[in-house]
């Protein structure tokens, strides 16, 4: 679990977020993060497999999701991106953005079907008040 989080943490270390971006630019930033994280396809697939394997073990499952060591830094990064895009209640929306990115990442890791992450993220960000 820690090794998976360490890899994700390395993906976001030293990431610079401009002070102000459009919602489309924010989506592009998030897509860049998603694409960078997706390069570790084996780690993402292993995490997905563990999630299914541990679905009945709340404590261990949470270490891969809500309580993962990287979750707080990812949520903080999402909040910074949302703030830069001028989105109200950024801190309230940040966990949802992290969840959406995680879902897109898992979908890609599973090779479920083609999905246009940029379109999905732009639509999500445009829909926020």
Where would I find each of the regions flagged by the language model?
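Helix-loop "lid/cap" segments that line or gate small-molecule binding pockets
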Residues: 31-38, 46-57, 81, 123-127
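Short terminal or interdomain "cap/linker" segment that borders an active site or interface and mediates
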Residues: 115
